[in-house]
Amino acid sequence: MPVVEPHLAALDQASVLLWRALGRGQLVQLFWRFPDGIDPEALERFRGGLAHTLLGRRVERSSLPFGRDRWVRAAEPGPLLVAPDALDPALIGTWTATAARLPVDPEDGPGWFLSVASLTDGGVVVGLTVSHVIGDGLAVAGAVRAVVLGNGGTTPAPPPRVRVTAGDRLDDLRVAARAVPGAVRGLAATVRLAREERDVVPGSLRRSVRSRPVGGGAVVDVPVVLARIADTEWRARAEALGGSTNTLCAGLAVRLGAALGRVDADGCVTSSLPISDRVAGDTRANANDTLVVRFHPDGVTSDLRGLRAEIRRGLADLREHGSLATAALAVAPFVPRAVARRLEEVVLENVAPVVCSWLGEHDPTVARPMGVVATDCWVVGGEPVPEEQLRRVGGALTVVGGSVNGRVGVSVRGWQPGAVTTQGELLDRVRRVFAEFGLPGAFH
């Protein structure tokens, strides 16, 4: 049974620092639909079991202002929130968007929560919403699997420190010292990134960070559409188009980006593809790198070979040279909050990416968290963002797909000012793009 490494890895440290700077952060949401209801006691056991997985921890600040934070044991499981009224199954997507507005706090807790709603057709929908600082999509799926198998997944993190001792400071200092070589390399990577983006970043960064307040205003319920398709049909269509299961998901994201108007001056869509490097026994919250692919949407609905080749080239380059962005994360503890806020805006204002994550085939246990097999299972990504900021950065689009028990679930979370701001408008685009690919599907 793996033991939780007490200090955060570089990507996890960067995630929590960005969360502190922005006052918000990315979420991972996992939803199940059960046709005949569930046992309330089984749901409560599932909630308690999650506290003994990687989700049962929170972030404790380092004793040093530039040090690595620590994982410590969370005081209690996340709460269970029950919807007061029965939900029309057609509105499950809308319900997931509402759940994204509820607060999670990876530092003070709760870092996650469960939500449940009865359906008017007699079924039940259950949601697990987790701060991305606590875990990525595969970490959350792994936590569910651990509870179902009854093995707890991992040894709980150490308890919080009652007080900071001289020994604690020395330990944090040792960890910080070991990180210095990586920080030096990270600084070099940051300089290279800045040079590569010199036509964009310097002018943007010269604008005062105080000229644009971050985090204010009403948070938008970004529309969510959930799609379901048989795994056999998904695989057959991918093969017919000369692609793979993950390339088909990427192709959908490219076409959806075009349908929402998320294209550059050349008509191309920039996709951000998380690439997992999670291994057995991995206790990192976020274990991935990011591949950025720029591709024109024309022709992708009839031939995926070009997109597949572009992704392969990018992966080969990532394996050989690594990611500059990942290397640059090592300097995150030394970046002032105001600069972190502005850097995020610079990227979003000038790139307007489409985030696409294909999680692959889940273990069947992921579909039966309470012992009963769910008919549908979806993972939803995104974050609660004020409308003023969403308009400024040109909206958002996240596509997440994966399969379990013979069914592929695809979630689309998107908002585009002046084009797509309601669930109905997003559903229209999703239906149209699925039809362009010749993909049948059921939608919520």
Model-based region annotation:
Residues 16-21, 213, 222-225, 280-282, ...:
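Short beta-strand/turn micro-motifs at beta-sheet edges
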Residues 1-175, 182, 232-237, 244-265, ...:
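Non-catalytic N-terminal regions of enzymes
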Residues 96, 134-138, 153-169, 199-218, ...:
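Membrane-interacting alpha-helical segments
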